[in-house]
Amino acid sequence: MTNILSPEKSENDQELPIRPSYLQEFVGQQQIKENLLVFIKAAKSRNEHLDHTLFYGPPGLGKTTLAKIVSNEIGVNFKSTSGPAILKAADLAAILTNLEKNDVLFIDEIHRLNTSVEEVLYPAMEDFELDIIIGEGPAARSVKINLPHFTLIGATTRLGLLSNPLRDRFGIPMRLNFYNNDELKKVLNRASKLLDIDLTESGSEEIAKRSRGTPRIALRLLRRIRDFAVVDSKSVVDKEIADFGLNRLEVDHIGLDSNDYRYLKFIAANYNGGPVGIETIAAALSEQRDALEETIEPYLIQIGLLQRTPRGRVITIAAFEHLKMPVPNKSHNQFNIFNDNE
């Protein structure tokens, strides 16, 4: 699923010029920043590596940026890879043996590591040792390699998919939450200065409230609205040009787009608001289940338009009102069955 409001990183997202390098430049996630600063200062004062750290939460909130910031704050090398890129234990061994003391190794999508790779990672995280099997069959032997102390930073949007042994080895687990409008405005104002965009307060407010609580989306929308401003010979991005551009991009006043409307209308029109299973929804919309669960559903749940229940997905009365559709003749409890994940 690819669209302007996807929180997933796109090849067109040019974030490096505006990505903050230190904690004082990073906007939002205040408690995480304060705690990280304490942990980093303590580790530096002891001349030790920072404990292994896990950043988890919805995509687009700054997990990769924070990982890079940690290495900058400590003053060490930053090595980056991803779960899908580490196909076998030898790939991980090659990365680990090239680390230096206190370096930061960042593994994005760490929940996608396969079991054989995880088994190599456990002793590396706990004992800073690497067990390598040399040879095959009866002649095979195990060789132990000592590793420098390093910090592993993992990032995941699917905490529940991490195995318990791996999750338990992270001494610093941190959940990143959606941003509020004021925080998004600060992100936009900082980016506008770095990108030389004349962004007004009203323009910043308009973009922020339609950005689904996600900085990556806010920055993407800012760039696209700048394009509309340039073509229309506007020198300033104000509320008027922001509203015009966002409407052209089919982003409504609360940050929903055509994919969200398809999702909500399917449940409303075909299942009287639900409950309906996620596999049924995915098949009907020709989308992958993971795409729905990671891209569409988190924000709909966040703003109170959707509930995940043991019996399936249920859209709320507020969703019917937003769709301007009549509310089915159900009791109020049927719209609030349970608040557990399916």
Curated annotation (Swiss-Prot):
Residues 253-342 are annotated as: Head domain (RuvB-H). Residues 1-179 are annotated as: Large ATPase domain (RuvB-L). The keyword Cytoplasm applies. InterPro entries: AAA+_ATPase, AAA_lid_4, DNA_helicase_Holl-junc_RuvB, P-loop_NTPase, RuvB-like_N, RuvB_C, WH-like_DNA-bd_sf, WH_DNA-bd_sf. One of its GO terms (biological process) is DNA repair. It is found in: Cytoplasm. ATP binds at I18, R19, G60, K63, T64, T65, E126, D127, F128, R169, Y179, R216. GO terms for molecular function: ATP binding; ATP hydrolysis activity; four-way junction DNA binding; four-way junction helicase activity. It holds the Pfam family RuvB_N. Mg(2+) binds at T64. Residues 180-250 are annotated as: Small ATPAse domain (RuvB-S). DNA binds at R289, R308, R313. It catalyses: ATP + H2O = ADP + phosphate + H(+). Its EC number is 3.6.4.-. Keywords: ATP-binding, Cytoplasm, DNA damage, DNA recombination, DNA repair, DNA-binding, Hydrolase, Nucleotide-binding. One of its GO terms (cellular component) is Holliday junction resolvase complex. Transmembrane segments: none annotated. Homohexamer. Forms an RuvA(8)-RuvB(12)-Holliday junction (HJ) complex. HJ DNA is sandwiched between 2 RuvA tetramers; dsDNA enters through RuvA and exits via RuvB. An RuvB hexamer assembles on each DNA strand where it exits the tetramer. Each RuvB hexamer is contacted by two RuvA subunits (via domain III) on 2 adjacent RuvB subunits; this complex drives branch migration. In the full resolvosome a probable DNA-RuvA(4)-RuvB(12)-RuvC(2) complex forms which resolves the HJ. NCBIfam families: PRK00080.1, ruvB. The RuvA-RuvB-RuvC complex processes Holliday junction (HJ) DNA during genetic recombination and DNA repair, while the RuvA-RuvB complex plays an important role in the rescue of blocked DNA replication forks via replication fork reversal (RFR). RuvA specifically binds to HJ cruciform DNA, conferring on it an open structure. The RuvB hexamer acts as an ATP-dependent pump, pulling dsDNA into and through the RuvAB complex. RuvB forms 2 homohexamers on either side of HJ DNA bound by 1 or 2 RuvA tetramers; 4 subunits per hexamer contact DNA at a time. PANTHER family: HOLLIDAY JUNCTION BRANCH MIGRATION COMPLEX SUBUNIT RUVB, PTHR42848. Belongs to the RuvB family. Has 3 domains, the large (RuvB-L) and small ATPase (RuvB-S) domains and the C-terminal head (RuvB-H) domain. The head domain binds DNA, while the ATPase domains jointly bind ATP, ADP or are empty depending on the state of the subunit in the translocation cycle. During a single DNA translocation step the structure of each domain remains the same, but their relative positions change. This is Holliday junction branch migration complex subunit RuvB.
